[in-house]
């Protein structure tokens, strides 16, 4: 009789959380909006201290529009005005097609983790973002209730694939940000 070895029975926790790209890399964020030099340390530390692996979501704005978001003067505008411009640019055919590809890649990763018995604890987006907002987004030159275009696409794709994953939005520098992340981690 041959015994089959269980895969991934090593030191890993078999738990992951998907974090918005800019939480781990502020260098990717739109001009004029970075709050810290590199990454939001407290969020990352909280996740790692809970022994949860981190999967960095792609930055849809960077991947679809480039680092300057298609306008080198974007940082001169008020944040919500620039975010509204970015949101509109994400609706253009080329950006929309690329956004669907990014969404499909994330859904594939989630399915792959779940297929192998990993717990996908959740997805953490960034509120006010035109792409990664969960509770609020930017449109009409202001912050409004609603989802960013990437999170909306991702939630629809997850539902279509029959995958259930909690999705929360935070404002990383807000005092309550860690309190919103901790329940995902089982704390």
Annotate each PLM feature:
Residues 2-16, 25-40, 44, 58, ...:
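Residues lining hydrophobic/aromatic ligand-binding pockets adjacent to catalytic sites
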Residues 3-7, 11-13, 38, 80-115, ...:
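Divalent-metal-activated hydrolytic enzyme cores
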Residues 13-15, 52, 118-121:
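Short coil/turn segments at beta-strand junctions that form active-site/ligand-binding loops
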Residues 18, 54-58, 122-126, 166-171:
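A structural signal for short, well-ordered beta-strand segments and their strand-loop junctions
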Residues 23, 60-63, 129-131, 171-174:
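Active-site-proximal loop/turn and secondary-structure-junction residues that shape catalytic pockets
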Residues 27, 64-66, 131-135, 176-178:
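Short catalytic/ligand-binding loop motif for oxyanion handling, primarily in non-cytosolic enzymes
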Residues 37-89:
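Short, surface-exposed acidic-centric catalytic microdomains
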Residues 119-138:
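Internal, conserved structured core segments that host functional sites
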